[in-house]
Amino acid sequence: MRILGIDPGLARVGYGVIDTSGGQQRMLDCGIIRTEPGYSEGDRMVVIASDLRQLIRAWRPELAAVEKFFFYRSSTTISVVQARGVVMMTLARFKVPVVEFPPMQIKLALAGFGHAEKDEVLEAVMRELNLTDPPRPDDAADALAVALTGWFQR
């Protein structure tokens, strides 16, 4: 199964693509969709949707795993939630099934406890994907963690 993991954001959307065929997980791709701070929020959303469409066309994921947020308090958080909405809409347009996970569930699935530190989750991602170097940037590593959680929780 090919899984696209997504760590939503307005400035940077982390993505990670894994393949789970053959009984092992392996990383196919990871990176970020970057938007320019000088652009309007609307233009930034267009960039996210356009780049995500390209990723979906290139990798043809059978499942998308998206980090889910629960608290919306600041204007920055609202922008992230709006970007997440663009991600969800784009996935729906391509008929990619979606599973969502809050950060604590991702940490629990990878590190064994919901309050794990970022480096503990990164270590688990590297172990599960048999990586010698940590995926960079952090948003891409987070997206791989989300993708792995999608696989473990299926």
Curated annotation (Swiss-Prot):
Which cysteines link up through disulfide bonds? Answer: none
Which terms in the GO cellular component ontology are assigned? cytoplasm; Holliday junction resolvase complex
UniProt GO molecular function: crossover junction DNA endonuclease activity; DNA binding; magnesium ion binding
Q: What is this protein's name?
A: Crossover junction endodeoxyribonuclease RuvC
Q: What class of enzyme is it?
A: hydrolase
The EC number(s) given in the record are: 3.1.21.10
Protein localization: Cytoplasm
- Substrates-to-products reaction catalysed: Endonucleolytic cleavage at a junction such as a reciprocal single-stranded crossover between two homologous DNA duplexes (Holliday junction)
Q: Which residues bind Mg(2+) 1?
A: 7, 139
Offer one Pfam family short name for this entry: RuvC
**CC cofactor note:** Binds 2 Mg(2+) ion per subunit.
Where, by residue number, does Mg(2+) 2 bind?
67
Protein function: The RuvA-RuvB-RuvC complex processes Holliday junction (HJ) DNA during genetic recombination and DNA repair. Endonuclease that resolves HJ intermediates. Cleaves cruciform DNA by making single-stranded nicks across the HJ at symmetrical positions within the homologous arms, yielding a 5'-phosphate and a 3'-hydroxyl group; requires a central core of homology in the junction. The consensus cleavage sequence is 5'-(A/T)TT(C/G)-3'. Cleavage occurs on the 3'-side of the TT dinucleotide at the point of strand exchange.
What's the gene?
ruvC
Q: Which residues form the active site?
A: 7, 67, 139
Q: Which domain of life is it from?
A: Bacteria
Give the record's family classification. Answer: Belongs to the RuvC family.
Cross-referenced PANTHER family = CROSSOVER JUNCTION ENDODEOXYRIBONUCLEASE RUVC
The cofactors required by this protein are: Mg(2+)
Q: Which GO terms describe its biological process?
A: DNA recombination; DNA repair
Give the quaternary structure: Homodimer which binds Holliday junction (HJ) DNA. The HJ becomes 2-fold symmetrical on binding to RuvC with unstacked arms; it has a different conformation from HJ DNA in complex with RuvA. In the full resolvosome a probable DNA-RuvA(4)-RuvB(12)-RuvC(2) complex forms which resolves the HJ.
Task: Give the organism the record lists.
Answer: Synechococcus sp. (strain CC9902)
Q: Which Gene3D superfamilies match?
A: Ribonuclease H-like superfamily/Ribonuclease H
Write the record's keywords in alphabetical order, separated by commas: Cytoplasm, DNA damage, DNA recombination, DNA repair, DNA-binding, Endonuclease, Hydrolase, Magnesium, Metal-binding, Nuclease
